[in-house]
Amino acid sequence: MKNILTRAAALVAAVVFTVLLASCSVTYDEAEIITASAELIEASYDINTVFFGSGLPAVESDDEVLRHFEIADDSPYHTKEEIKTAALAVYSPDYAEFLFEKAFVGFSVSVGEEDSIDADQIIDARYVEYGDRLVILPIAEEDIMKLDRTYDTSSISVVSQKRGRATLSVPSFVDGVPAEDITLTVVMTEDGWRLDTPTY
């Protein structure tokens, strides 16, 4: 009986190992990766604007007491969930978590000596929901990221791929001028390929 159980356990282990080995060795069609990546890169420009650039269009006010402006009616998104859904259609869940922390929670950055009073500067959340209204924290023009990098998505090459992760090399332009090739990563998720690195 003991020998039978031992053989059964060994057989199960062998099957599991074979399945794991097969899953690790799965490779995806490069044309599929390139097509999906091109679409994701193009879609990332608008998402980058929401999180790093000028943000969603807002109804501005001259009232100096107001720290946030209401999102305009013609905005493509009007709730946190809509923004999150749009971001997750482009970026991986792991990278999207960084975006959500920055946009909806806020964070601190080191700006001085470790022991100084200004060692950490608190950056407020950019988007806040008050009841059923989404508002945006206006930021100074000089603090808006200059999103001037674009990509030649017709010339994407797959450098490597392993375990549902592909490394790409993509020619880029800065202000329309040819610049260096950028290394980007895409990962396979439950919903398909997603960017796992920023494109700005």
Describe every region a protein language model picked out:
Residues 26-200:
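Mature, Sec-exported extracytoplasmic domains of Gram-positive
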Residues 20-23:
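C-terminal motif of bacterial Sec signal peptides marking the signal peptidase cleavage site
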Residues 2-12:
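Bacterial N-terminal signal peptides that target proteins for export
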Residues 1-2, 25:
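N-terminal hydrophobic targeting signals that begin at the initiator methionine
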